[in-house]
Amino acid sequence: MSKGVEFNRLMLDMRAMQMDAMSAPKPVSGAQEAGASSFADMLGQAVNKVAQTQQASSQLANAFEIGKSGVDLTDVMISSQKASVSFQALTQVRNKLVQAYQDIMQMPV
């Protein structure tokens, strides 16, 4: 059940980050700050994180299938669902980006 506790902690961390982001508006500047990551970097990191989540889920499922001790079915299912949800979220982000690109391309100049 340690994965359940880990999931709850992850959700609490995400909510805390969301509240921090919403509470402190940042000034808009024309130049990018030194050391600040671009949107492309953030998107690349998100893709890598989803790939790592899927790989970890696959490894856990394989360990369960071969009967490795200490691997519980609930852990496998939770890991699989995490990978699925993260992939679906990434797919939605991609769809929104494609739609935004198409909208911009259809704008009259």
Curated annotation (Swiss-Prot):
<comment type="similarity">
    <text>Belongs to the FliE family.</text>
</comment>
<dbReference type="GO" id="GO:0009425">
    <property type="term" value="C:bacterial-type flagellum basal body"/>
</dbReference>
<dbReference type="InterPro" id="IPR001624">
    <property type="entry name" value="FliE"/>
</dbReference>
<dbReference type="Pfam" id="PF02049">
    <property type="entry name" value="FliE"/>
</dbReference>
<dbReference type="GO" id="GO:0071973">
    <property type="term" value="P:bacterial-type flagellum-dependent cell motility"/>
</dbReference>
<keyword id="KW-0975">Bacterial flagellum</keyword>
<dbReference type="GO" id="GO:0003774">
    <property type="term" value="F:cytoskeletal motor activity"/>
</dbReference>
<protein>
    <recommendedName>
        <fullName>Flagellar hook-basal body complex protein FliE</fullName>
    </recommendedName>
</protein>
<dbReference type="GO" id="GO:0005198">
    <property type="term" value="F:structural molecule activity"/>
</dbReference>
